[in-house]
């Protein structure tokens, strides 16, 4: 199921600014669902192979077990870039977020100060991606705070890896 209250395109002739108001996606069979006040998909007309996704400060996620999650953030964006050739091969994808909080209808909560996740095609090696992650100040749910060597928070996580597909 996919529903929305409005779809609007603005910004032309310099940009394509697609705003989807009150999107609601759900799979009644599996029980998964997602909704938000809006989603924006943005691109420059002179660079349509680079698309930006802007997400709202609050989103709702429904899980198959009946649990409802609220994802809050002060900033949450993603972008994907393709090579500007007729085949549009993948170039890079980035997800950036700040002030993230995930709370559950079952009473748990976790937070994340910042996150940057990236994947980039390695042009010198076929079927190879370079992956990166920078995560700062992860606060885990109270139920996990007493796990040895974990504690109530992770101060930082950094990943720089190459993956051959």
Question: What is the predicted role of each segment?
Answer:
Residues 131:
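Catalytic-site microenvironment of enzymes
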Residues 146-165:
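Solvent-exposed beta-strand/coil patches in large extracellular/periplasmic or lumenal scaffold regions
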Residues 140-144:
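Outer-membrane beta-barrel proteins
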Residues 2-128, 136-139:
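N-terminal beta-strand/beta-hairpin edge segment
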């Amino acid at each position: 199921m996919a529903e929305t209250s409005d779809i609007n395109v603005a910004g032309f002739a310099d940009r394509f600014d697609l705003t989807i108001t009150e999107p609601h996606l759900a799979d009644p069979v599996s029980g998964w669902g997602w909704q938000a006040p809006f989603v924006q998909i943005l691109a420059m007309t002179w660079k349509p192979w680079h698309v930006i996704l802007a997400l709202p400060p609050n989103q709702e996620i429904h899980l198959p077990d009946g649990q409802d999650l609220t994802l809050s953030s002060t900033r949450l964006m993603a972008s994907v870039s393709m090579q500007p050739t007729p085949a549009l091969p993948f170039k890079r994808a980035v997800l950036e977020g700040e002030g993230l909080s995930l709370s559950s209808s079952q009473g748990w909560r976790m937070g994340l100060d910042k996150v940057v996740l990236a994947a980039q095609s390695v042009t010198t090696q076929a079927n190879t991606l370079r992956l990166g992650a920078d995560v700062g100040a992860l606060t885990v749910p109270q139920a996990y705070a007493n796990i040895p060597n974990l504690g109530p928070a992770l101060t930082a996580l950094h990943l720089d890896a190459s993956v051959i597909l």
